[in-house]
């Protein structure tokens, strides 16, 4: 229940912009397969934008929670071995989305190879990058990590993503570099060290830097060294 309390807010603030980005890149009608969809936030955003989509996740609990929020789009439970088959067999979808999925896999190449063999035209991914946030998490080990959390097996870079595109004959047709490195820095400074008066410390920190934190972050985003990236690939294997 608590997981879904902010469901609509997250859909509006986080996932609707992802759909808007995808629609700008892919001009034709989208039929989407969302793997690792969790409780279906992205599916709900797609639904609100009139896009037909089906989601799969390994968590039965999240599938049930998500379906309570969805009207047309649906979520199904499947283990990962079945998911590889789903990618290769489903011809009705023209877009595959992996939102925060590849970094959790021990064998991401297996999934990418299934996409390569499929007749799905587009691949939309969101992955974490080796970035300032990564260094912060090493320097502030007592602050909860987002990039180096225990269930992340991979971080990516611009170079490694270009390598994957070349290896699997994919063309990058859309990219959106947008990170949270400087908000992570603020969070790390606030939640560590011997601070005599945390309230005053936090107030001073935000008064000094919050007005131009977006400008600072934009420098990293522009140079493609931010904490995450959205990429859309076109499958050039058929």
Regions found by a protein language model. Give the residues of each.
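Short catalytic/ligand-binding loop motif for oxyanion handling, primarily in non-cytosolic enzymes
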Residues: 41-43, 132-135, 181-187
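A SAM-dependent methyltransferase catalytic signature shared across enzymes that methylate proteins
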Residues: 159-176
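Flexible, glycine-/basic-rich loop-and-beta segments that form/coincide
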Residues: 184, 191-197
